[in-house]
Amino acid sequence: SWHAAGMVGQLRTSNSLTKINKYSVELYKNISKKTKLSIGWNQCGSLILGATDQRMIQLQRTAAMAKVFGVNAELIDSEKCLEKWPVMSNEGITGGVWLPDDGKVEPEKLAQCLAKCAKDNGVKIFEGISVDKILIKENLVYGVQTNQGEIKSEWTIICGGMWARQLGMDIGVDIPLYPVEHHYVISETVKGVTANLPCVREPDEMIYFRSEDDGGIRLGGFQKISKPWKVNRIPKDFSFKLLDPDWDYFKQPLQSGKRRIPQLQDCQFQKFVNGPESFTPDNNFIMGMPPGCKGLFVLAGFNSVGIASAGGAGKYASEWLD
């Protein structure tokens, strides 16, 4: 989504999911050469921190799995973690996994670049238009009804993110995802922070952070108890909007971030982003053809890894339908 954090990691829990993200990285590295549009790609690498013995066992498995999946990864100690991100504190950190080929992008620029590539290859993109319903007859989907008329097609792909569930519900197709508030903050310039610092994830605290081009820090996180938003139906007028900041709900990730990066203690935050995103029960995205329905394909519910998976998911979905 346009308000995503823009972190692009390759390693996932299976070879097939990792293959999807690896293709995304290759695409993002080269797409600007074709379009002459910058997407802000920066192969800064990523770092996963471990703060417990149990986490380090899991990270050892992660490093071994990366090797099997063809992803460059190195298990490093606490001091080397600090070398990768000198501004943070390594207190309580036992070690981590360093993934040098990961990176970050600017989501809005990436979307514009992908759209240009699509148009250059004959795709028509209609903006300022809404899909009122999916057209179906005798279990065969043959297009969509929009507020500007019908669009008929051999295949209809639901890739509407958090809107996907309600589109499916209207024709009896269950797409198990729902909107959840997802928060991150962007700090003012922090001394010592540069654009080339790696993206960092600390799963024990459920936080992530990355540097900004202007020397700020983007800090986000997840909660054990999520905050759903408009589960039944999303308002028709909600588009390219953010929700109100919720500092109380973000208290735990913010405190964890300030402990890890002490300079944030006395720092002002210039932006609070509260953007709803789609999440699924098993934390895996939905990709495939719903049973009992022809001509329909679903690609949605990316659980905050939409930017990292978009390139590969689009590639393999198109090959599936070819």
PLM region descriptions:
Residues 1-2:
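Glycine-rich FAD pyrophosphate-binding loop
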Residues 6-84, 206-209, 214-216, 244:
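Dinucleotide-binding Rossmann-like beta1-alpha1 core, especially the glycine-rich loop
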Residues 9-11, 15, 134-245, 252-265:
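Flavin-dependent oxidoreductases
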Residues 30, 42, 51-127, 132-140, ...:
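Flavin (FAD/FMN) cofactor-binding and adjacent substrate-gating region
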Residues 31-40, 69-72, 122-124, 169, ...:
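Surface-exposed helix-capping loop/turn segments at secondary-structure junctions
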Residues 42-46, 180-181, 272:
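Short Gly/Ser/Thr- and Asp/Glu-enriched loop/turn motifs at secondary-structure junctions
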Residues 74-77, 125-127, 146, 158, ...:
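General beta-strand structural signal in soluble alpha/beta enzymes
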Residues 107, 204, 244-322:
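C-terminal catalytic lobe of FAD-dependent flavoproteins
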